[in-house]
């Protein structure tokens, strides 16, 4: 069996004078969670729409499960778009069964699977409510269920956590991890870099319509390592040592009097040398390399913070 469930190769797409995708290539491993990252307007949603046969590329190819992607393959993809699209006036259960039947399930099988999901997410009381009676977060739970109910091998979630409070966002994260562990492959587009570190095996970062960074999350973080270490220590307050290390962050003492520091050592200094100098001042409790976060890497690569992006979404 091919280890890649989906591969996009040299995909480009233009809308009038706007280039949405410029020679984009990604490989999605079977059974992995793949993060598609980038600002609004970077090209993420255009790529997702090409994968779902909503729009066609101007050039390039998309391969699904070892063969060129066709319209028939779309039935094996579950897609949760950022723009939610349920019918407000219909009853929740009636609509969910209808959508499941469109994906090839019989009415009996659809109802059985849906009721199991409704029980799992503790929303059985919503079955006979109209969608317009539910909050945005409740509606998103329903649409999540209708996306996964036919058990497609590939699931695509576009900004799945928007509109959720922290508790429900954590619930959805657990469900996504369970789906991966059950053998599903997940692609999700997000601005939430913390979610990337929690969930993703691999990522591709798109900026100005091109892939500027890709790989396994752990490898990407190691690629951007910068001689920074985390130290938790007892004893006196640690002082920096010229030409050996600087202290970039120092926390207040905890209940036991332990302090946590972030240190940046000089490149020529070995870890053994650093530790030797540290124990002269303090009693180390934990000491480990501190890899940059995905947010830090995003800022360094793209040159702007996610929270300050004002790029229009031309996708």
Listing of model-derived features with the role each one plays in the protein:
Residues 97, 194, 218, 276, ...:
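Active-site phosphate/pyrophosphate- and oxyanion-stabilizing loops and adjacent acidic/basic residues
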Residues 3-8, 13-207, 212-213:
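ABC transporter nucleotide-binding domains
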